[in-house]
Each structure stands twice: as structure tokens, then as C-alpha cells.
């Protein structure tokens, strides 16, 4: 495998490993600890893909967290003290991310970096992502760059209350061995301001907004059905900017708000009430 120690890590696979069709790329965004990865894992579970051998999976998950830049010694020292802003767009290797997604969309097998959140470093080991029919790419800023945003065939935004997100982040970082005071200082100094400046404004690019994350099974089930239709070949893959100009806008906030399909070209009136405070 290619080394991930500071160099570009994605590498195309041999021609024999490439599929005959391009995958359907779904972007999943939302604030820190909003439940993005949990939503993706639930989708995988409901599709019966989480027990499938990696090479045979029709749906795969990839995280933006894998594309954090390699830190200098000075930056790593700050990171270990909770004084480095991991929620800023510049914290990510966007060029590598774009090239990797481009290769994925072209149906190639790629190798992606592995990031250690305890030591704040990119590990030598890489992870192989095999071609799949549907790829879920999740992260706090996956909609920030237009170049990357425009690659998605469907965009989901997981909209979870800020207090819930904070409590989840505290529990997660404590499990990583972080000090509570450091966690809270980092949240107020970097995480919350970055969410409001960089992540929340990208909510407007979402086709489907999912309040309460994985607890919102109305939205999850609808998305799963949509993906199942794609896997079954019942829905033609659509691309933004096409002749029909299709886009889907929908927010699912209340029990019973479950149309039979994603609503084309409009947002639900419930969306304005789902913004975090």
C-alpha cells in the first residue's frame, strides 16, 4: 500500500478491479457529533451491507476526517493542548480529498489515509476503498468547497441540537483521553465558532435535511429506499446541471411527514424551525 506519511495517499487500482459503472456519490454533512457517521452506519445496516465482505459491498462509507493535513511539530504541539483548529477548512487536505473522490467517482479502487485522533497524526497505514454502487462521504465541511460539493449526486445535512452535539463530543473526547477543561475550551474557542462560520452556512446546499439524526427514522427509511432503488436499477442516476435541472429539497421534522419520494424542487416549510440555536 502507499504510505500515508505526509504524501498523497490515493492510488488507482489495476484496470481489472474497476467496475463498469460510476457510483452514486452521497455527501453527508452536519456539525461535530451531530450523528453523521451514525446515520451512515444505520443506512448500511438497513441495507444489509455492514456484514458484507469489503470487496463485495455495494455501499461504502468514507469520512472526511481521514483527510486532515499532516501537522508540523509546532501544530501537533498545539493540537495536543487543544489549541489547534481542526474545524477550519484549511485543516483538511482538500486537493487530496478531491483527487480521491474523483477516482472513486470514476470507479477506481483507492487507498485513503488513516488518521490517529489521539496522537493527531497521519499513520503509515492506508485503508483500501473498493468500488461500490453507492458511496457515502461524511464530514463537517464536505459541502464547503464548491469543487467537492458539486461532485455529490445527493446531499444530506444532519441537523442536531447544539447541546446534544456538545454532550456527545465531550463523551467522545473523554474516551480519547482528553481533559474535560481542554475539551470545553477547544469547543468554545474553535468548534462552535467554526460551525457557525463554515458548516452551518452550507446547510442551504443540502437536498435533504435530517433533524435529530439517526432518531429520525422517517428520513432514514426514505433515504434507504432511495438507495435501494438505485441499487436495484429502478432510478436513473441524475447529475446536477443536467437538462432536467432536478434537485431535491426536503426536511423531515414531524411524525407523519413522509412523502413517497423526495420532493422535487422545494423545501418543506418545517426547515426554518430546525436550525440549531
Swiss-Prot record:
Pathway: Pyrimidine metabolism; CTP biosynthesis via salvage pathway; CTP from cytidine: step 1/3; Pyrimidine metabolism; UMP biosynthesis via salvage pathway; UMP from uridine: step 1/1
EC numbers for this chain: 2.7.1.48
Organism name: Homo sapiens
Protein name: Uridine-cytidine kinase 1
GO cellular component annotations of the record: cytoplasm; cytosol
A single GO molecular function term of this UniProt record: ATP binding
A GO BP annotation: UMP salvage
InterPro entries, per the entry: P-loop_NTPase, PRK/URK, Uridine_kinase-like
Active site, UniProt feature: 65
Gene name per UniProt: UCK1
Binding site for ATP: 30-38, 215
Phosphothreonine modifications at: 251
Comp. bias (Basic and acidic residues): 268-277
Keyword Nucleotide-binding: yes
Function statement: Phosphorylates uridine and cytidine to uridine monophosphate and cytidine monophosphate. Does not phosphorylate deoxyribonucleosides or purine ribonucleosides. Can use ATP or GTP as a phosphate donor. Can also phosphorylate cytidine and uridine nucleoside analogs such as 6-azauridine, 5-fluorouridine, 4-thiouridine, 5-bromouridine, N(4)-acetylcytidine, N(4)-benzoylcytidine, 5-fluorocytidine, 2-thiocytidine, 5-methylcytidine, and N(4)-anisoylcytidine.
Domain of life the protein comes from: Eukaryota
Family: Belongs to the uridine kinase family.
Reactions accelerated catalytically: uridine + ATP = UMP + ADP + H(+); cytidine + ATP = CMP + ADP + H(+)
Residues noted as binding substrate in the record, renumbered to the chain: 87, 115, 120, 169, 178, 186
Alphabetical UniProt keywords: ATP-binding, Kinase, Nucleotide-binding, Phosphoprotein, Transferase
Residue span of region Disordered: 1-30, 247-277
Modified residues (Phosphoserine): 253
Tissue expression profile of the protein: Ubiquitous.
Amino acid at each position: 500500500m502507499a504510505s500515508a506519511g505526509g504524501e498523497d495517499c490515493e492510488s488507482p487500482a489495476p484496470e481489472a478491479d474497476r467496475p463498469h459503472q460510476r457510483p452514486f456519490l452521497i455527501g453527508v454533512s452536519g456539525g461535530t457529533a451531530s450523528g453523521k457517521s451514525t446515520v451512515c452506519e444505520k443506512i448500511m445496516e438497513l441495507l444489509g451491507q455492514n456484514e458484507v465482505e469489503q470487496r463485495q459491498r455495494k455501499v461504502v462509507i468514507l469520512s472526511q476526517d481521514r483527510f486532515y493535513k499532516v501537522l508540523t511539530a509546532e501544530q501537533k504541539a498545539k493540537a495536543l493542548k487543544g489549541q489547534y483548529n481542526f474545524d477550519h477548512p484549511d485543516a483538511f487536505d482538500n486537493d487530496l480529498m478531491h483527487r480521491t473522490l474523483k477516482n472513486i467517482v470514476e470507479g477506481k479502487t483507492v487507498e485513503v489515509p488513516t488518521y490517529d485522533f489521539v496522537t493527531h497524526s497521519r499513520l503509515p497505514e492506508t485503508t483500501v476503498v473498493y468500488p461500490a454502487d453507492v458511496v457515502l462521504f461524511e464530514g463537517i465541511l464536505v459541502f464547503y468547497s464548491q469543487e467537492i460539493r458539486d461532485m455529490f449526486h445527493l446531499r444530506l445535512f444532519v441537523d442536531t441540537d447544539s447541546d446534544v452535539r456538545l454532550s456527545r463530543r465531550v463523551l467522545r473526547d473523554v474516551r480519547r483521553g482528553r481533559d474535560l477543561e481542554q475539551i470545553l475550551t477547544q469547543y468554545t474557542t474553535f468548534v462552535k465558532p467554526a460551525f457557525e462560520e463554515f458548516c452551518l452556512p452550507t446547510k442551504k446546499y443540502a437536498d435533504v435535511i435530517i433533524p435529530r439524526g439517526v432518531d429520525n427514522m422517517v428520513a432514514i427509511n426514505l433515504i434507504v429506499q432511495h438507495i435501494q432503488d438505485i441499487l436495484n436499477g429502478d432510478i436513473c442516476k441524475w447529475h446536477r446541471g443536467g437538462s432536467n435541472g432536478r434537485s431535491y429539497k426536503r426536511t423531515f421534522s414531524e411524525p407523519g411527514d413522509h412523502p413517497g419520494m423526495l420532493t422535487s424542487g422545494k423545501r418543506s416549510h418545517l426547515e426554518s424551525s430546525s436550525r440549531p440555536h
